[in-house]
Structure formats: C-alpha cells, structure tokens
UniProtKB/Swiss-Prot annotation, chains A, B:
GO MF term (any one): chloride transmembrane transporter activity
Membrane in keyword set: yes
Residues passing through the membrane, by range: 97-117, 141-161, 196-216, 253-273, 292-312, 337-357, 378-398, 462-482, 484-504, 506-526, 535-555
Keywords: CBS domain, Chloride, Chloride channel, Ion channel, Ion transport, Membrane, Repeat, Transmembrane, Transmembrane helix, Transport, Voltage-gated channel
Organism taxonomic ancestry: Eukaryota, Amoebozoa, Evosea, Eumycetozoa, Dictyostelia
Assigned GO CC terms: chloride channel complex; intracellular membrane-bounded organelle
Protein name: Chloride channel protein C
Domain of life from the UniProt record: Eukaryota
Pfam family, one: Voltage_CLC
Length: 757, 757
C-alpha cells in the first residue's frame, strides 16, 4: 500500500484523522513534543544508519510483500467444514513426497554440476599441461587464458540472456523472499537454468568463485518450482498441487530448498539445516526442521550415491562436492587457544575489510556499469584475463622445491593424493609451490592447504597466495557470472591460517599448521557472513571429526564479534544494494520512541461491504494499493468501521468472473459456480488485468458482495500502538497489510513493510 | 482470566452480546448451523483426542500464563525517550556476561556431579568387590544392596524435602515454562538444589536413570536464577539486574540454560543448541542461537577443562560426561542400510511401547500413590531392591567366558580400556558377560556395547540385558528420584542394536556390530522422545565421527515415523499428566471450523480509564482475573470501548503505593514519586496482597488513573476471527491475554491459554 499516492474516491471515504481528537491519546499528554520531531520520513531503522539515496528509497517503496497469512474468508470456512482427516493426511503426505523429489533433484543437480566442472577443468588442464610438459611457456599460457576467457564469456553470456538474477550467489534474494519480500522472477525457471549453466562455466574458468552460494539459490528455485508445479507461460495449472500454491507453503519449500542446496554442495546435511535456521529463513517451525533435515539427507545421499556409483564399490562413505581426508590423531594444547583467538581476530578484520571493499566496489559497479551488458561482459573478461595472468605467472616468482623435501609423518593416516604437488615448469622431482595452489582446482588447493604435512609450503608463497586470493575474491564477487563466496573465503582463510601456523612453528614445537589452516578458514567465513553454528557444523562435517571443535568455535566467535564491530554481514549490505526491504527480527533501538501513527499511511482507501461495480472499478483504477479494508458504515453512516480486508488480486478475479451480488438486505448470497476450489484456483494464478475487462452498463450498475471473500481474521492494531510493538507483530506474523483502527474501530491507517523499513 | 467465574460489578459492565446482533456476522449467514453444534466445552484440540477428566480439566484451567509481552505504557515510553545508545549496549553486554557466568556455573555443576558420582560409585564397587574377590556371594550382595538402598533412600528423601519438582527429568516443566505456562517453583532454588543432590545419589545407586534430563532442568534453573538474581524470601532485589527481570528475558535465559545443561552433560555444544531449538523452546530468535551457542561452548569447555586439569596434560580433547572412543576406519555397505532401517523400525516400536507403558504406569502412580511420601519412598526402595537383585543375580544365569576369547582387530586404534571386562565371580582369566553390562557404571556398559571387538558378547546375554534394561527403564522413570531417560534408552538401544548386528553377522561377513549398537541407540532415543536433528548431532558429537551419519539419520527418521504412528513423544504425554497446558505451534485440524467467539470467555470484567478506588477494590476482590481491559465509555456512555489492558499485579502495586489521581478532566497526571524505575522495580516483585491494604474512607473515595500504566500496545482481535487464526496469533506472539472486540471496538470477550488449549 503506497503511502498516500491517491486521494480516495468514494464519498464515504474522508480523512477522519481529526475526528477522534477529543479522545485521549497516550502519546500526547505533554503537548506536542512527539508530534513534531518525528516526521514520517525520518525513520531510520537499521542498526547502523545507512543513508539511502532518494532513488533507492523510492525503489524500496515500490517493492511488494508476499502474502503469508491465510485468507480466512467464508469460502475457506465452508471448505474447512467439509475437509476430513484424510484430506489433511493427504496434504501432509504430499509435502513429504515433494520433499523427497526436491532432495533427489537437488542432489542430481549437484552431481551434474560437479561432473561437468570436472570434465571442463580436466579438458582445460589437459590441453594446458600438454604444452607445460613440453616446456612451452607462451603456448601453455595462451591455451590457459583462451579457455578461461571462453568459459567466462559463455558464463557471462548466460547471465545476460537469463537476466542479472542468474549472477552472483543469489543468497540475498532468497533471504529477502523468505522474509516476505516479493523479488520478481528470482526463483523463476530462467534464473534457475541460467544460474546452473553460468555456475558450471565460471567455476571451471579459474575465477575466484565457489559453487555453494549458487547451489543455495538453485535449491530454493527448485523448491519453489516443484512445490508450485505450474507454469504461467504455458497456462499449466494442475489441481494436484493446488493446496500448496500459496506464498506460505511456497516459503517453507524455499527454506527447505536453500538448506538442501547447501547440504548437497558441501555434503553436510546438518550444516544445511542450520544454515536455513540461522541465516536465510525468517520464519521457522519445528515441523520444518524435521522436513528440512529429511530433504537435506536425501540430497546429500543422492549426490554421494551418484558420485560413488553402486557397482564399483559396495562400501559407502559420505562425501560432498568438497571433502577433505583430515587427520585425526593430533591434539592441541591449551596454550594454542590463544593463537586460535588471534586467527579469529584476523578473520574478523579481513572479513570486515572484505565486506567494506566488496560493497563499495559493487556500488561503483552499479553507478558506472549499470545494467549495460557490454560493459558487464567486458569487465568479466578483463577480470578473467588478470586472474589468468596472475595465477599463471605468479608461480615463476619463487624457486622450485624438491618433492623429496616433503616428509609425511608416520602417525598420520592421510589420503596420500593430497600431497601430490604440481610440477608446472619445474624440473622432474621438483614442484612449484604457488603453482600447486593457484594452477589447478580450488578443491585441490584447499586439500593441500589442509594437509598434515608441515613442510609442504614455505612462508613467502603462502603470503602471496593469501593476498592474491583475497584480492581476486573481492574483485570477482559481483561480476555478472554465477558464483559464491564460500570456497574463495575458505582459501583465503586457509592461506593465512597455515601461514600463521607455520610462522609460530618456528618458535614452538609440535605445531600442526593444518589445524591453523582449518581454523583460519572458519574464521574467515564467520568474518564475512557472520554465521556461527552453521559454519562450525559445516567445518565439522567437511573434516569428519569433532576434535577441533573448540578451536573452530573460538575463532568463529571472535571473528564474528570483531566483524560486527565494523559492519554488518555481506548479505545485509547486498540486500540493501539490491533494494530488498528486509525486516530484521527486532526493530532497531532508535525506533523506540516512534508511534505507529507517525509512520502509517494515513490515506487508506476502503471499500464498503457491498460495493457497486462502477465504484469498485473506479477505485481500483485510481490507485495501486494491493489491499483494501472492507468497512461497514455503521448506524451513523459516515463511519467506516473495520470488518475485514480484501486483496486487489481477489477483487480482480471476482470482477473477471462477474461474481455479482443478487441478494437483498443483509443476507449473504454465495455464487454456486464460484466455490472455494474455483476461488483458490483462480486467485493462485496471475490475476486478469482490469483494463481488459469490459463491463456493460448493466454490469457496472450491479453490486459485488465482498463479505464472503474478504479475510475476516485479518490482524489489526489500535492507533495507540508503538512502532516497536507493531513491528514485532508485523514481523512475527509475517503480515503484508496491517490496518490501524481507532477507538471507534474506524480505519485510520495502514501499515505495510515500507512503513516499517 | 478464568471463564465467567464471577459476574462483573461495575454498572457499566453488562452483557452486550446481543447488542451487535443486527450486524453481519460472517459465520452466521446460513441460520444457526454453527452456533448450535459447537459448544464451548467441546473444543478438543490435541492431535490425538486425549480425554481429560473433569478434575484434570479444572486443574489446567487454574494454571496461569507467563507474561512475554512488553508492557508498553506511558512510563515505558517516557523511559525510551531518555535511553541512550549506551544503555542499550550495556544491556546487551550484560546479557553476554550473564551467559558467560551461566556457562561456567553449569559447567562446574556438571563437573561436580560427575566427580561425586564417580566417588560414590567407586566407594560402592570398592566395598562390594572386596567381598566379590573373596568369593563371598552373600556378603557382596548385601553390601551392594545396602549401599544402593541407602543412596535411593537419601535421593528420595531429597525429593520429599525439596518437593516433587526435584524428581524425574524436569524437561516437561521446562518445556511448559518456555511455552508460557507458569509452573510454580519449578525453577526455584529448592528444586535446583534438591535435584542436584537427588541426581547424584540416584545415578550412583544403580537405578536405570541418567543424568542428562536433570542436567537440562538444572541448567534452566541456573539460567533463571542468574538472570533474575533476586530472592523473594530474602527480599533481595538488586537494581543491576532490573532490566532482565521480566518473563521475556527470563525465558531466553531459561532456553539458553536448557541447552547448556545438555551441552555440559554430553559434552555436545551443537547438540545442546539444537535440543533447545528443536525440543524445549517455543520461541526462538537468531540472536538466541548465537548466545546459546556461546554459552554451550563455555559450559562444555569448563567441564572438559576441569576434568582434565591444566597441570597433568597440556594437550586438550573435548570430552563430556559420556564419551566413547569410537573407531573410525570401518565403512559399511549399501546393503546394510536395509538393516539400519530395520533397527529404526524396532527403535520406533520399542519407543512407542515405552511411552505407552510409562504413561500408564505414571497414571497408576498418580491415582494410587498420589503425593504420599511414605508410599513414594517405599516404591523407590522396592524398585531399588528388585533392580539390585536382578542386576546382581542375572550374571549367574550364563557361564563365564575366557578373556582370551576377545580378539582385538588390528585395524582398530581403539581405547583398550573399553575391552576390560568384569570378572565378577568368574575364575581368573574369565569374565561374566552380563556382569560386565549390569554390574558397573552405565558409562562402562555403554562403552563395552559400542566396542569394536565383535566377539565380546554372545547373543543370549545381550537379549537378557536388553529386556532387563527396557523393563527397569520403564519402571524407574517416574519414581520420586531425579533421573533422566537418555542413558537408559541408549543402553536399551545399544543392546538390541548389537544383538541384531551380531545375529546377522552369522550369515553375512564383515558386519561391525558396534555400528549397529550406535544406530540402535539413536533409534531408541528417537523412538521415545521424537527428536531428530538433535539426536543425530549428539550421536556424532559423542562418537567424534561423521562417518555413520547416514545410518544414524536413516534409523532416527524411521524410528520417529513409526513412533508417531502410535503415540506422541513422552514429553507431550507427561506435560498432559502434569496439567501443563502446552500450546503446540499449530492448532489441531479438528479446530478448523470453530470460531473464536465460541471459545472466548464472554463475561469480561473491564475497568474504566479513571476508576474509583472503592470500585476497583471491589472488582479485584470479586474475581480472580489476572488482567482487565481498560475501557472508555465513549460518547454514548453505555459503551465499553477498548483502550488498553492492565494486569492485576500492576493495579495492586498502584493501590499499595496509593498512586491516586489528582488531576481533572482528560488531563493526565503522573505521580512524581512513581516513575518508570519505581514501577518496574515494584512490579517485578511479588505484588502485595489486597487483603493487607487498609484504605480509609478518603482513599476509597479517591480515583486511580489507569491510563499511564495500562498497556496501550496490547494485541486485540475482532470477534469475526476464526479459532485457528486467533490461536496462531496468540501462540506466535506469546500472549497471555487477547481481548476480543466487536464492530464498535467494544470488548466482548477475552481469550487466554485455557480457552485455546
């Protein structure tokens, strides 16, 4: 409901704000102290007062909310009387079936992505290594660069074709949708397909992007798609999924999908559930925990099952897109906890630094490059060229080392493949340190960084690696290619962690720098996205051991605290940049002394219970409000007593199907041809546009009875409410419209997301 | 607000139900179909229609709710205007400090309990084994029995002294409190102390009880105590903790405390967080996740640190009250998943069976033994005798086995102490199988059951052990001693799991029965308490490995489904037995076609905004309602227009301090001596009883202005609401009173927990 965009039409509708002035208002007992210094526009509501430009503000104002409340009208109530226990069971059972399919599909997608990436990277390194092994530096580089550029070009092209929603990780959009913000087409089929293809190509291209963020978006999109199972383009609306075709059930499936995407990507089902609880979801229930867990397990199991195949080995082991065989025998000392705290501090600082630079870079991009596909394509290609050059030529800075330098400790039962290093242009029996980290898959680099073998790397290459990966992570995030931040951040963290571990091992004995790498990764992740439990669990699930729980937890905590001192998580900032009015679970303290009557939209357009079609059409045409309180004029005829609320879309459907009132007096007449099923089916589609409905004179003179179709259980508040309490009510109940009534039950205002944000 | 217990006094207050009869009611359009077949008493609301006896119903009706909403009155608003950012920061910082202390204290309690139990059990077995090694069966048994009886006697005595709230696990009470039910003294100092002592003694006595459930209760009690930091008996109310002294903040600390108790008991911080999210807490927020996690880590770390000591070994490893060195090398095959499903099925069946028998046994206890301490004490001693006899003499059923039969596989790097068996009365070099399981600590028995060594036990002793432990778990739960169910259930599960594993290993090769024991434990736990993610995480944290995630998850899921088919979780049933009106997150389907006007209490007692003391005292004396809507009589004087709501306790404080109205007309006069601090301090204490206030005639003729003290942001609903939507609003917002208004904003009803349950 836009704020006072239009004057109401109906003659019954008048500004009655002054009408109740003789009634005691608990805010105004001391003159007009409050009424002056809070104007409606000065509501700053974020924990940190971000300054939004007028354009950004306007953009946010235009964003609509999703409709999480049940439309509890007469039809619904009649339907309830008919529904048996069997139907409820059927609906619940159907949800489990959808979850099963969701898990299997997301698992398969994760498998396909992993396989195709493996294939593409294999091809790239196959051709490049052909020249490398022949010692042809120039040719090798050109091949490397050429293939990378091709991948980035195609990846960026996919984004241009499928729209910018296919780029980046998509987590801010998912978070916004789960908070109740309508982000158009974010979970559409085009964005889904574009993201999958773009992700495969960008991840193969050697850019510093990871697959996890996009997998979360992909999971959410699959969840939205499979639960709705309709197509507006194809006009395909099967009735089987009708009962799930509302924003509320859709939200639950999107929550599940997001968790599932992460679970499949990391092979971490518990981590997935916690990610959904802690980070993306705004509404949660116990039932959802259980269903999400089920779906995550199915997805992780599917990926795992496909990766191993059933024929080759009957043993099973759970692996995800990224798993490390981490050693389990070493224990650390109490005194080392101080070092882990230090790693947490570094992680928090670097994380906050990352967020700062990334956000400013994205702002610059938004201003300079805008949505221009040529500039965006050029930028992506440019980043790719620089990345390729640096990754290729950085290896030449340092001398080659002898493979025989690496001594594997006997106490470690480690996967030996981790220690295979990259020879690059080194003589036989020697290896290139930076080449082993930069010239290959990120997975392999991470495995090497997490390796137990302490003397694998020297300090300078680790430092250079950390700086390079930090720099390119910042630069690559926000390009018009699909890509997440988890893996790049883990690389940065593992880099500085191992660097630190090896540094202090010069003074102290028995330091295992692999733990430091692990802890560094966790700290870095906590530093940029400010999650806690979720990161700890993911790290535990990745490394398959709980021995390092205490150091990881310590580092994550400190990192989060340090990061929070400087700025908010990268998702919060990105949501703001993308004009997604996200409502935090609590309003900021600065709103404590605002009253709801200061911020509510005062010129509410209301509809009478029985309304002439002519009037209705005029009212609908004259504004763009999405909901209208339905009023009863009461015994004194100039009143507008609140009775219920009805959505514009529902009125449009009623008008389109000519559900006119044929009764008399106060009796309610229900159209036989327009029962609950019909109403639900039609309102779940996109509503017909008003302009295409042509009413003849007779129809315009008819009446529509809104009472059977309005929501009689809509939450309202009195105008004595404080902002804070109204916010909590709005946020906790997931409302879209919150009518404000006065002492006489007359509608005096309307609160929507835009008034609260 | 009890339902229509008294007739209202005020002359303005009349039954105005018929007044709005000419106004359209969306429920009544088809005659009086609805109005007849829903009477107020027929609301059955549980998923399964439990039949409550009239006495039980009456008991539940008398139970009050906690007050989670902010009392947003004029004083509060004035206070907000004064509060600076620094004060908010101070409050947040204070919460972290409280969490830190909470973690340390709970960790220390867990350590003390573990140490004392170790000492007591050590003494017991020291004296018993003295006779055992001399071959004196009779003397050994009498010593064993005598010490067990002494422990049980003292443990039961503690419960008799401290009240029945110190018995059992206390999880239902904590769950109820977190849902908003006022369970008197459940978290009091007496219950806390009684529970700690009783737990130590009962756990040492060889009864089939575990320490985890009580630890959760202890954690919650510590959380409540430390955050409130007051004593009503000692009249000690420091102002430092004033801002946390409300039900809302207390609830959060209790949630954290419950998680922390579990985390300290199991050494499983993530499991603790998930337990709080999944099982006990009804209200959760993202901030809470983070704070709970911090506290859990602190507690687990404290216990761990104390157990290991800093001097002896500089290495650290995380262990809780119960940890197993589980082997990590073995992988299972896909075909075995079927077996794990079967274990899930068994776990679900046994779990449901356990719940069924336990509930009926408790019902029998409640009817026959009542609260009679002698009977209760006798019962506990009787169970102890039978347990001691069975645990002691069962070992003689089976022949001794040669210690040399146990072959430790070389591939396993296991803690060798696990395989040390109990010799009991066997010749040297031999051991008693049942003695190793029943004659010793539960921890040791569990360790042996989870041991990798396959040929440690034969099938018949395992079967007998499973049956014995199932039988005694059922019998012991509900005795008047403190004790939980986690460990006994794990033992049952491990028993049948290992039994099953060893049985099928007769036909198939390479079966590791230790995995089966682990999976069996998980299945059994899921079968009786119906948790999912939490159990999986606890098992992972206990065994320190994620390799067996898939089997555990599979078994837990199937077990939960199977169990849910038969009955609800043991906590749901116990809450009902304890007359705790717990509100599930969703109302049951059977309430779909009830309207809120059918169930609301119709004879609401209202108060005018400015009220004569005489009238007020009369009204307060004439009923036991806890809140009163404050009304304005409007321009037509016989109306009762809703303006706000005020609690009885707050009125009592106002009366006690003679905060009388001295103004005139509509102007509001605030008493200078009764500001926000004073109001908060006084209302956070127990209110003075009305009977002790003696008013003189002048005072009785005075007026009280309720407007500055009433809650102006109280949520209300219209009488057109459906039961389901009102329930959701009430439950999600954690309300205590929900006034119902009609089309004229007149108060026509009141909804409280008792109307919804």
């Amino acid at each position: 409901m836009g704020s006072s965009l239009n004057k109401p039409l109906s003659d019954r509708v008048e500004d009655i704000n002054n009408q109740s002035s003789m009634i005691y208002d608990p805010w105004r007992h001391r003159g007009d102290v409050n009424s002056t210094y809070h104007s409606s526009s000065s509501v700053t509501h974020r924990r940190r007062n971000h300054r939004l430009s007028p354009l950004e503000k306007q953009k946010m104002k235009n964003i609509q909310s999703l409709n999480f409340s049940v439309n509890d009208n007469l039809l619904q109530r009649e339907e309830y009387e008919k529904t048996t226990k069997g139907l409820h069971l059927k609906k619940t059972f159907g949800k489990w079936i959808i979850c099963l399919f969701l898990g299997v599909i997301v698992g398969c997608i994760a498998y396909v992505i992993k396989m195709v990436v493996q294939l593409l990277q294999g091809l790239k390194f196959h051709y490049t290594n052909h020249y490398v092994s022949n010692g042809l530096q120039g040719e090798a580089f050109l091949t490397f660069l050429g293939i990378n550029l091709l991948f980035v070009f195609l990846s960026c092209l996919m984004v241009i074709v499928a729209g910018p929603l296919a780029s980046s990780s998509g987590i801010p959009e998912v978070k916004g949708i789960l908070n109740g913000v309508k982000v158009r087409e974010a979970l559409g089929f085009r964005a889904l397909l574009g993201k999958i293809v773009s992700l495969v190509l960008s991840f193969s291209s050697g850019l510093f992007v990871g697959p996890e963020g996009p997998m979360i978006h992909i999971g959410s999109a699959v969840g939205a798609a499979i639960s709705q199972f309709k197509s507006s383009t194809m006009g395909f609306y099967p009735s089987l999924f009708l009962s799930y075709r509302n924003d509320r059930d859709k939200r639950d499936f999107i929550s599940i999908g997001a968790a599932t995407g992460l679970a499949a990507a990391f092979g971490a089902p518990i981590g997935g559930v916690l990610f959904s609880i802690e980070e993306v979801s705004s509404f949660w229930s116990r039932q959802l925990t259980w269903r999400t867990f089920f779906t995550c397990v199915i997805a992780a199991f599917t990926t795992n099952f496909l990766l191993q195949g059933i024929g080759s080995s009957p043993d099973m082991h759970d692996t995800g897109l990224l798993t490390f065989g981490f050693s389990r025998l070493y224990l650390f000392r109490y005194s080392e906890l101080l070092c882990f705290c230090f790693l947490g501090l570094i992680g928090g600082l670097l994380g906050a630094f990352f967020v700062f630079l990334n956000i400013h870079l994205n702002k610059w991009r938004k201003e300079k490059l805008k949505q221009n596909p040529y500039l965006r394509l050029f930028e992506a290609l440019f980043v790719s060229v620089v990345t390729s050059v640096v990754c290729y030529y950085a290896s030449f800075i340092f001398d080659c080392r002898y493979q025989s330098n690496i001594v594997i400790e006997t106490s470690v039962c480690e996967d030996q493949s981790n220690t295979e290093m990259v020879q690059f242009f080194c003589p036989d029996g020697m290896y290139s340190e930076l080449g082993s980290l930069l010239f290959g898959n990120p997975d392999q680099a991470l495995r090497r960084l997490y390796s137990r073998t302490n003397n694998m790397f020297t300090l300078p290459p680790l430092l250079v690696f950390t700086l390079i990966s930090l720099f390119f992570s910042i630069w690559s995030s926000g390009l018009w290619v699909a890509g997440g931040l988890f893996v790049p951040m883990m690389m940065v963290g593992a880099g500085f962690g191992r660097l630190f571990g090896q540094t202090i091992s010069m003074w102290f004995t028995n330091i295992d720098s692999s733990i430091y790498a692990l802890v560094g990764s966790a700290a870095m992740m906590a530093g940029y996205c400010r999650m806690t439990v979720c990161i700890v669990v993911i790290m535990v699930e990745l490394t398959e051991g709980t021995q390092y729980l205490v150091p990881i937890i310590l580092a994550v905590m400190i990192s989060k605290w340090v990061g929070d001192f400087f700025n908010e998580s990268v998702y919060e900032h990105l949501m703001e940049q993308k004009s997604i009015p996200f409502l935090q679970s609590k309003p900021p303290h600065s709103t404590n002394n605002i009253r709801i009557s200061d911020v509510m939209s005062k010129n509410v357009v209301v509809l009478p219970e029985v309304c002439q079609v002519r009037l209705l059409v005029n009212i609908l045409n004259s504004n763009n409000h999405n909901a209208f309180p339905v009023i009863n004029s009461g015994p004194y005829d100039n009143q507008r007593l609140y009775r219920g609320i009805i959505l514009r879309d529902h009125i449009l459907v009623l008008l389109f199907y000519r559900v006119f009132y044929r009764g008399t007096g106060e009796e309610i007449y229900l159209d036989e041809n327009f029962d609950f099923d019909k109403f639900t089916t039609e309102t779940s589609k996109s509503p017909p546009p008003l302009s295409e409905m042509n009413f003849d004179q007779f129809e315009l003179d008819s009446f529509i009875d809104l009472r059977p179709y309005m929501n009689s259980s809509g939450v309202t508040i009195h105008n004595t409410f404080s902002f804070v309490e109204a916010y909590k009510l709005f946020r906790n109940m997931g409302l879209r419209h919150l009518p404000v009534i006065d002492i006489n039950n007359e509608v005096v205002g309307m609160v929507t997301r835009n008034d609260l944000f």
